[in-house]
Regions:
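Short beta-strand segments
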Residues: 73-75, 132-134, 163-166, 185-187, ...
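Glycine/serine-rich anion-binding loops at beta->alpha junctions
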Residues: 96-112, 192
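Acidic-glycine-rich active-site phosphate/pyrophosphate-binding loop
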Residues: 79-94, 158-159, 174-185
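Acidic/His- and Gly-rich active-site-bordering loop/insert found
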Residues: 2-101, 122-125
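Metal-dependent amide/peptide-bond hydrolase catalytic core
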Residues: 2, 174, 181-373
Length: 373
């Protein structure tokens, strides 16, 4: 049984299954559900199709019965593995680290939650333990939203304490920033430059880009868009640009600018999104917007203090990146708390320290014993 409940082996098994966000995550979800069933979980398969028709699966596992227990929330999707630079889809232990895409973000943390819940005796549980493995976190969190809206297992055993197990080096995180994108497309008229009959979308979008350059400077000091609980307090205002591969001897038919920044939990970011959209529409450009709010729970909230106490008194902090916490917090008070370092996420050579993985598993089990038994 000890070998079967090895978080390193379980993480490696999931790393070996490619589950990049833009494609489906069916295979890794089948693996997770099969493992859960083999270890005494009642499971629920929640599936939808994304805008590209890809199947996206969310697995909810439950041990025990009764509301007011523990919920552990992770995702099975990953960013692309950059296969030209390393072998990302093979879990490899070297020294005191486990390497592979998703080892840190976040198949390792998911494995720790699964092992912790599997290790407890269901007959001794007075409240249920929920373990969820969702899709599309890297693309905006649709899987978490879908799960909170459609999971009957979770609704019937709604936890009082939620752990979003993203990598925080096992430091409790009570607040984080979100993400906003404004996609602006200028349309010209394609033609060979020898005819001089085209209209370059690159020239059309240039005045808007100049406005964004000025706006980027002003938002750094505008108190409406700053959150002083965070380091840095600014929102990381950025812009990327593409004319979709147009060559220099062709007038560009399209040019797309994507403006992005990180909203705080309670700033005025909606106003900034609307201002950018209005400026783009002034020029007649196509505009789409998306904004995911940041997250904040009081640092003295019960779930935050639980993580702090059971991790040896680590003090709660804030982080500038985003997680699925806002989606799950619609139902369950959450703290972000997981093994591994965010500096390893999305990197070539991504790894998780084995000591962190084992420590997380032990802490998660103590949480279950404290809250559910």
């Amino acid at each position: 049984m000890a070998d079967r409940l090895d978080p390193v082996a379980l993480t490696s098994g999931m790393i070996d299954i490619k589950s990049v966000s833009r494609w489906n995550n069916v295979a890794v979800s089948e693996y997770v559900e099969s493992w859960m069933k083999a270890h005494g979980f009642e499971t629920e398969w929640l599936e939808y199709k994304d805008e590209n028709g890809e199947r996206k699966v969310n697995i909810v596992g439950k041990k025990g019965d009764g509301k007011g227990g523990m919920g552990f929330f992770s995702h099975t999707d990953t960013v692309p593995g950059q296969e030209e630079d390393w072998e990302p889809y093979r879990g490899v232990v070297e020294g005191d680290r486990l390497y592979g895409r998703g080892s840190c973000d976040m198949k390792g943390p998911l494995a720790a939650t699964m092992i912790a819940a599997a290790a407890v005796d269901a007959s001794k549980l007075k409240k249920a333990v929920i373990v969820a493995a969702t899709s599309d976190e890297e693309l905006g969190g649709e899987g978490a939203r879908f799960t909170t809206e459609h999971s009957k297992l979770m609704e019937g055993a709604l936890p009082a304490y939620g752990i979003v197990a993203e990598p925080t080096l096992l430091t409790p995180v009570y607040a984080h920033k979100g993400g906003a994108t404004i996609t602006v497309t200028a349309k010209g008229h394609a033609a060979h430059t020898s005819t001089d009959l085209g209209i370059s979308a690159n020239f059309l979008i240039a005045p808007f880009l100049a406005e964004m350059a000025m706006l980027a400077k002003s938002v750094k000091t505008d108190p409406r868009y700053m959150s002083h609980e965070f380091n840095p307090p600014t929102n990381g205002f950025n812009l990327v640009l593409t004319d979709h591969g147009t060559r220099s001897n062709v007038f560009a038919a399209r040019c797309t600018a994507i403006v992005g920044f990180r909203p705080g939990p309670h700033d005025k970011s909606e106003e900034l999104v609307e201002e950018i959209a209005q400026r783009a529409r002034h020029y007649g450009f196509d505009v789409t917007t998306q904004m995911n709010r940041g997250y904040r729970v009081e640092p003295d909230a019960a779930v935050v203090q639980l993580a702090s106490q059971l991790s040896g008194g680590r003090q709660p902090e804030t982080v500038p990146y985003g997680t699925d916490a806002p989606r799950f917090a619609a139902k369950v008070p959450c703290v972000v708390f997981g093994p591994g370092s965010i500096t390893q996420a999305h990197t070539v050579g991504e790894y998780i320290d084995l000591a962190q993985l084992h420590e997380a598993t032990a802490i998660y089990r103590r949480m279950i014993e404290t809250v559910c038994m």
